Curated annotation (Swiss-Prot):
Endolysin with lysozyme activity that degrades host peptidoglycans and participates with the holin and spanin proteins in the sequential events which lead to the programmed host cell lysis releasing the mature viral particles. Once the holin has permeabilized the host cell membrane, the endolysin can reach the periplasm and break down the peptidoglycan layer. GO terms for biological process: cell wall macromolecule catabolic process; defense response to bacterium; peptidoglycan catabolic process; viral release from host cell by cytolysis. One of its GO terms (molecular function) is lysozyme activity. The bacteriophage lysin is a powerful lytic agent with a narrow target specifically for dairy lactic streptococci. Pfam families: Phage_lysozyme. This is Endolysin. CDD domains: lyz_endolysin_autolysin. Transmembrane segments: none annotated. The active site is at residue 15. It comes from Lactococcus phage c2.
Length: 226
């Protein structure tokens, strides 16, 4: 079974794409490029089309077979796509963590558990797991145009960005997928007051954590998201 466009879109929503080779951590031997493709050399550059094509190849050659081996033909397309996204992010948890045989109820109970990194719960992982669960639970016969990742509702929230000393430095607004710098007090008032009926929650994160969760670089001085 192959991942659908909905599955690819879900993965792209939570994975950053970089068209120049980089090392996420300095001790890795090879470089990473595109949508997290590992194994290229320093100085490699790709086009967006190359990155998109390689993502599909990587998923269907490596991660989709993991899910196929687990579900044994019992999953529908949305269930399959959600589990592929989980595998792409967390690896072959079905084998590594000894998952019980596939059933909808069992998998729905397991997906939200993968929200920790470094011994801490990360809100970015919480949001990704919820997006996967929403898709997993969505009937394949649905013709709704609602957003698959949010059940049709864009869930906005504000983020207080802290510098390395823990001091509030900048404000951001996010829908759980992308992040935007709140540049002026007027913009902040718009989010807090004029949109008060949305009852936006407020999260507090170090700016380095924001960069890690959304795969973006932030200028510490200006707060701009690059």
């Amino acid at each position: 079974m192959k991942v659908s466009q909905n599955g690819l879109n879900l993965i792209k929503e939570f994975e950053g794409c970089r068209l120049t080779a980089y090392k996420p951590v300095p001790w890795e031997q090879m470089y990473t490029i595109g949508w997290g493709h590992y194994g290229v050399t320093a100085g490699t550059t790709w086009t967006q089309a190359q990155a998109d094509s390689q993502l599909e190849i990587d998923i269907n050659n490596k991660y989709a077979p993991m899910v196929d081996a687990y579900v044994k033909g019992k999953a529908n397309q949305n269930e399959f796509d959600a589990l592929v996204s989980l595998a792409y992010n967390c690896g072959n948890v079905f084998v590594a963590d000894g998952w019980a045989p596939f059933s909808h109820a069992y998998c729905a109970s397991m997906i939200p558990k993968y929200r920790n990194a470094g011994g801490q719960v990360l809100q970015g992982l919480v949001r990704r797991r919820q997006a996967e669960l929403n898709l997993f639970n969505k009937p394949v016969s649905s013709n709704s145009n609602q957003n698959n990742q949010t059940g049709g509702m864009i869930k906005m929230y504000l983020i207080i960005g802290l510098d390395n000393s823990g001091k509030a430095k900048h404000w951001y607004v996010s829908d759980g997928v992308s992040v935007r710098h709140v540049r002026t007090i007027r913009m902040l008032e718009n989010y807090q007051n004029k949109w008060a009926k949305l009852n936006l929650p407020v999260d507090t994160m170090f700016i380095a954590e924001i960069e890690a969760e959304f795969g973006r670089k932030i200028d510490m001085a200006s707060g701009e998201v690059k």
